[in-house]
Amino acid sequence: MNQSDTSLIPNRAVAIFSGGMDSFTLLNELVQEGKEVFALSFNYGQRHSKELECARQVCESLNIAHKIIDITAINSLLAGSSLTDDIQVPEGHYEEENMKSTVVPNRNMILLSLAIGYAVSLKAEAVYYGAHGGDHAIYPDCRPAFVEIMSEASKLANYEPVEVRAPYLYETKIEILRRGLALGLDYGQTWTCYNGREKACGKCGSCVERLEAFDKNDATDPLAYESVCTG
């Protein structure tokens, strides 16, 4: 295989875009940096699938390529998460022990593997996802060691050295939101709540962390909430 077959296209990137505020901020930053972005969203049977409609609308407004991939066929292999099974979504702070029920087994390894394959086919230089520092306590597949090893595995598994990048790996959601607010982003275009109801619940760990981020930035969350957890 000659060099032209394996060369990657500079500034071409695949971004895993859930429709949530972290990946929304990342997507917009990549676009503003002048990257040619291909957004990739996944339906894995999550109860908060409302985020996928948000993702679709955002990509349409940004006029960027977007695919929503249905992988619900593997849902029966990934039992035990309150995000996909008939298990109550826990309430309280994002870093509390009971939030471990929101872990979907091996989720990011699966999603990143698919995104890497897509990047190889596009000759994109990197896959981006919005893992951040606040995820480390609960989600093993958002920790620095995982990102580093996944990036190395990508290079070993393919002729094309596609990197896995998580720019917010050492930042909190408070800091990520600060970035987006400085860019003038509209977070009313995003969905964070783990419950798939009409309004955000205001009590699940994801809502609590989001509301905390807005509070710490002296900003008002544009989303409507059923209630707000003050504990």
From Swiss-Prot:
Catalytic activity: 7-carboxy-7-deazaguanine + NH4(+) + ATP = 7-cyano-7-deazaguanine + ADP + phosphate + H2O + H(+)
Coiled-coil ranges per UniProt: none
Recorded metabolic or biological pathway in which this protein acts: Purine metabolism; 7-cyano-7-deazaguanine biosynthesis
Keyword Ligase among record annotations: yes
EC number: 6.3.4.20
Keyword Zinc found: yes
GO biological process, one term: queuosine biosynthetic process
Pfam families for the chain: QueC
Residues given in the record as ATP binding sites: 17-27
Cofactors required: Zn(2+)
Protein residues bound to Zn(2+): 193, 201, 204, 207
Keywords: ATP-binding, Ligase, Metal-binding, Nucleotide-binding, Queuosine biosynthesis, Zinc
InterPro entries in the record: QueC, Rossmann-like_a/b/a_fold
Highest taxon of the lineage: Bacteria
Molecular function (Gene Ontology), one example: ATP binding
Cofactor binding annotation: Binds 1 zinc ion per subunit.
Protein purpose: Catalyzes the ATP-dependent conversion of 7-carboxy-7-deazaguanine (CDG) to 7-cyano-7-deazaguanine (preQ(0)).
Similarity-based family: Belongs to the QueC family.
Name of the featured protein: 7-cyano-7-deazaguanine synthase
Gene symbol of the encoding locus: queC
